From Swiss-Prot:
GO biological process, one term: chaperone-mediated protein folding
Ranges of Basic and acidic residues composition bias in the record: 428-437
A GO-annotated cellular component: cytoplasm
Chain ranges of the PPIase FKBP-type domain: 162-243
PROSITE patterns: FKBP_PPIASE
Domain notes from UniProt: Consists of 3 domains; the N-terminus binds the ribosome, the middle domain has PPIase activity, while the C-terminus has intrinsic chaperone activity on its own.
Primary subcellular site in the record, as a coarse category: cytoplasm
Extent of Acidic residues compositional bias: 438-449
Protein name, entry field: Trigger factor
InterPro entries in the record: PPIase_dom_sf, PPIase_FKBP_dom, Trig_fac, Trigger_fac_C, Trigger_fac_C_sf, Trigger_fac_ribosome-bd_bac, Trigger_fac_ribosome-bd_sf, Trigger_fact/SurA_dom_sf
Amino acid sequence: MKSSVEKLSDTRSKITVEVPFSELKPEIDQAYAALAQQVQIPGFRKGKAPRQLIDARFGRGAVLEQVVNDMLPNRYAQAIEAEGIKAIGQPNVEVTKIEDNELVEFVAEVDVRPEFELPKFEDITVEVPAIKADEEAIEAELETLRARFSTLKDHNHKLKKGEFVTINITASIDGEKIEEATTEGLSYEIGSDDLIDGLDKALIGAKKDETVEFTSELANGEHKGKEAQISVEITATKQRELPELDDEFAQLASEFDTIEELRESTVSDVEAKQKNEQAAAIRDEVLAAALGEADFALPQSIVDEQAHSQLHQLLGELAHDDAALNSLLEAQGTTREEFDKKNVEDAEKAVRTQLFLDTLSEVEEPEVSQQELTDHILFTAQSYGMDPNQFIGQLQQSGQIANLFSDVRRGKALAQAICRVNVKDSEGNEIDPKEYFGEEEVAETESEA
């Protein structure tokens, strides 16, 4: 077999392959055997008809077509391996020549991983937020816990931020009621600022059974962007009542008997949470810095495929209802054009990151153990809410286990590279990235995941 490569662009190559008939005996034998099973010729057992009779019945062209179909995948794989082509995606293959008993020639065009220089991670410096398990952070965590066990009590004083109301809202333009912006019995927390612009300001200082009025620009619907008169009737007012931070609360909200024990545990929880956040920040900052120094083109077809996959996944959550997506975008205050643009940008970022990490993996050459792969599969199954055995069965059926192996390999390659980066926190303290990304730490994290 002979092959040659023509570089079409930084991200696409054309491979021309010639396969002599002398190398195609297994495929020829297989083609005749398959066709022989399809015909019953008097005087011969099924599957034992001579080749000249099969040629006469089906034509030599049918045999050659079967041979070509059988040989293409294997010979293509051999050619790109021999030429060192880092192919991504499916090739476009065209058989350009069939000379019976001489050779078969085909041409394959395929997207390839672009070549580029990796940055020197030793020269990268990043800054991440400092860990501050101070009293303020601890109190904030305890307040969050108190809020989970709070109760709502009726009151009749002037409303304040953080209190709750039940309201009826009526919107009108030039005296005409806007049905789509009108609702009754709506529960709302003052200060959440996620309903109507100006609502919080109007409610603060008001009392139960009062009606407040103001003007606001409608954010959604047929009258989006128009000024409307808003009338809000306050039918109920409530305030949050928090439990005392005492031993009784500790026993109610945790496994501890005293508030001192709960506070000590909260300190440890805050420190662990901030360490996890700091590790994630290091990873994100290093990856962003490294990608910023690596200049390479992206295969457009791969970007298009990624963008389509992202859109398909989102539509799947909406029962593949395109109109529902447009309604969702309108409720979020964005347009389909803006969404499509961001979807492509996200796809480009995802493809760029994967191509970068694939190249980094080849340089770092991390080893992935069976246990690491198993842990990652179990973690992924858990994130999808699937039974691990069922998930593994689906992976085997679809041939996706190799993809998860690559995910683990990319993560380990990046961890190895991060260990060479200079890291400081926002207070100027040096951080040893090996504390988070050393071999033992990475293995422990994956095991816990």
